Amino acid sequence: MTKKYLFESIVKIRDFECDMQGVVNNAYYHNLLMQTRTEFLESIGIIRNEWSVERGIDFVVYETAIQYRSPIVAGETFRSCLNMHREGARYIYIQDFRRESGELCMRARVDVAVGLNGKLTRGEIFADYMKEHGVEFQEQPASRRTNSKIPNHIDDVIYDYEMKVRDYECDRYGSATNAFVQRYLEVTRLEFMEEMGETFRKWHENGVDMMVSKVDLKFIRPMMAAEKFHSLMNIRQDGPRVIFEQEIRRKNDMQLCVRASVEIVGIVDGELDTQGACFFHFINNQVPEWHSKNKM
């Protein structure tokens, strides 16, 4: 590959990391991305657990945008590549998954902040450490994300699904991992489809695969073990894409925990539906009809 990266590692996909189609589940990408960032930190002498316990320093994921390009299947080996720069108080990881041929399978932007004793900082601790250890990174002015598709709020919630955070879905701090947060969003979409009498398998049998092409997530508050929450959703079409606008709010006080935008494209008989025609009846007829009977 001609592109230079700050860090690379080799990853092999195992059967248990895949779904029924034998491809890596979209939510599991968060674990793979975290694994690479952790290995990068370890390569420069930072053990996350030790920094947290001994120094009170934690790395907090604030926002994630994942673009899925080509499915990764069971048994495949790929290169997990990482670059990083700084924008104000945030450290921006640009992460690529590439096959040995150089083909890009996935690209992610992960915004990370540095916390000290439970409070967010300007990130100087991390910057000073990297400079002392000869790690080169660019520093850029802080800027607002202009390409984020995450809505500020959902104008019209058409579906509300209640769930609960389980212990096994949490990290050592007792909060739901990013992978499980994305899984909650996926479960909500699946339950919504099933309530309308639709399933992704049914669409597949009719020659249409609904493929997630992009996920934007903003993590606002941690979701703690045993907490109940509402997973809220709206759906609309934008050209060839169906957009699921989603929020997660705590049940006890309706505080916002997560905002998300999930883009779906249609693959019809193996070809991308560039007009999104496969969704027209669903969006313009089925969804409004279901909504009129189930208004919240």
Question: What is the meaning of each model-derived region?
Answer:
Residues M1-F40, Q140-E198:
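Catalytic strand-loop segment that frames the active site of acyl-thioester-processing enzymes
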Residues M1-R69, V73-G75, E194, D273-M296:
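Hydrophobic, helix-prone linear segments
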Residues F7-S9, Y68-T77, C81-P151, F219, ...:
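HotDog/MaoC-like acyl-thioester-processing domains
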Residues E8, V61-E63, I92, D160, ...:
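Short coil/loop residues immediately preceding or within conserved phosphate-binding loops
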Residues G45, G197, I264:
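Short, small-residue-rich loop/turn micro-motifs
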Residues R55, V60-T64, E76-S80, M211-V215, ...:
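A generic structural signal for short beta-strands and their flanking turns/coil linkers
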Residues Y168-V258:
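Structured core of small recognition/catalytic domains
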